[in-house]
């Protein structure tokens, strides 16, 4: 692990002894999940998917048992792992926690971004964006910042198609986005 040049020390935890081990927040706590395979060069798709699922299941168990409230996943072949059961990892994780309303958040202290839709081809995005979806996502993000980070967020909803007003008299931003922002402001959410 020295090759990664982490500033914190690493600690390997025994998966079977987790309830007897104390989590040290000053270290990076790792759990090695064995990949059972006799042929190291070629992993069959089913074995890869099974391994990824075991890793996720352990992570979900650790979250549910209160060992952590964070999850970082590395790159995986979502198409093969999810096998058309979910649009993406966000939806997969939501299903494992029985959550119907979720938001994907790319978080940074200065600027965070949350797309209204996830894992959709661009041609389907405009059909999915509704006033209800905008309200749902803004409330999810607002609640996250207030309850988890104890911050009062300033939320900006960017236009769905900002240059459309110059063509005909149809403008999705006026019809969908702007009217929902006004509704959210009435609910005391700092959104523009």
What kind of feature is each model-predicted range?
Residues 1-192:
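Anion-binding alpha/beta catalytic cores of soluble intermediary-metabolism enzymes, centered on
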């Amino acid at each position: 692990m020295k090759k990664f040049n982490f500033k914190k020390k690493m600690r390997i935890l025994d998966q079977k002894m987790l309830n007897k081990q104390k989590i040290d927040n000053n270290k990076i706590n790792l759990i090695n999940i064995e990949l059972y395979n006799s042929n190291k060069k070629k992993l069959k798709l089913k074995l890869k998917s099974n391994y990824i699922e075991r890793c996720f299941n352990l992570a979900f168990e650790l979250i549910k048992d209160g060992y952590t409230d964070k999850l970082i996943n590395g790159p995986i072949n979502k198409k093969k792992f999810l096998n058309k059961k979910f649009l993406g990892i966000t939806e997969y994780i939501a299903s494992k926690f029985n959550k119907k309303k979720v938001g994907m958040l790319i978080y940074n202290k200065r600027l965070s971004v949350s797309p209204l839709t996830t894992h959709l081809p661009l041609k389907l995005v405009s059909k999915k964006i509704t006033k209800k979806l905008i309200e749902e996502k803004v409330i999810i993000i607002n609640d996250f910042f207030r309850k988890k980070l104890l911050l009062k967020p300033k939320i900006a909803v960017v236009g769905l198609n900002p240059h459309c007003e110059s063509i005909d008299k149809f403008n999705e931003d006026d019809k969908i986005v702007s009217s929902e922002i006004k509704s959210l402001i009435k609910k005391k959410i700092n959104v523009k």
